[in-house]
A protein has these predicted regions:
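Surface-exposed acidic/polar loop and edge beta-strand patches at domain peripheries
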Residues: 2-174
Length: 174
């Protein structure tokens, strides 16, 4: 291929054997690599700049370790939930406890940043990723469908997210 960027290629496998793909997007000014693991923005390169504009890992293991939050689309609830519980529509729900104390952080081990997203659609300058989270996953109510679109135009990267649920549920991603 002689230096040509492949639009979709393997990035490797998670420790539990799930395949991770990387999607390369390109404009005249920008090249962006998105991963299906956590919808991670893995690499951003601006034409004429010799270094990457983002921090990332060259392999899946990095994103399963200390870089698990780097560049990923986190949720369904980002940050912390004090006490690992919340009342939603009159019912109390319990969430995964973080090792650092009595709180849930970034939706726990089943958060969106730990999931493999599906490639629904792609082109040279965009990709649409989808993810379905089942009712009760991570303690959160509702069957949730999330769509995430990355577009590049010129030197700009735009991310658009939409979500739906069949039940009241907290959704505060980042």
């Amino acid at each position: 291929m002689g230096g040509q960027i492949m639009p979709i290629a393997s990035f490797g496998q998670t420790a539990d054997g799930r395949e991770v793909q990387k999607i390369s997007l390109r404009s005249e000014q920008l090249t962006v690599t998105i991963l299906t693991l956590g919808a991670v923005i893995n690499d951003v390169r601006l034409t004429g700049v010799a270094w990457p504009l983002t921090l990332g890992s060259p392999d899946v293991a990095g994103y399963e370790g200390k870089l698990s939050s780097f560049g990923s689309f986190m949720g369904p609830v980002i940050n912390r939930i004090k006490g690992c519980t919340a009342e939603i529509d009159g019912q109390r729900y319990t969430f995964e406890k973080h090792h650092s104390g009595n709180l849930t952080q970034h939706s726990g081990s089943t958060g969106m940043h730990r999931q493999i997203w599906s490639i629904a659609e792609h082109g040279p300058d965009y990709v649409v990723l989808t993810l379905s989270l089942s009712d009760g996953l991570g303690g959160f109510p509702g069957n949730r469908d999330i769509t995430l679109r990355y577009d590049i135009e010129g030197a700009s990267l735009r991310m658009t997210a939409t979500a739906s649920s069949d039940a009241p549920t907290p959704f505060n991603p980042a």
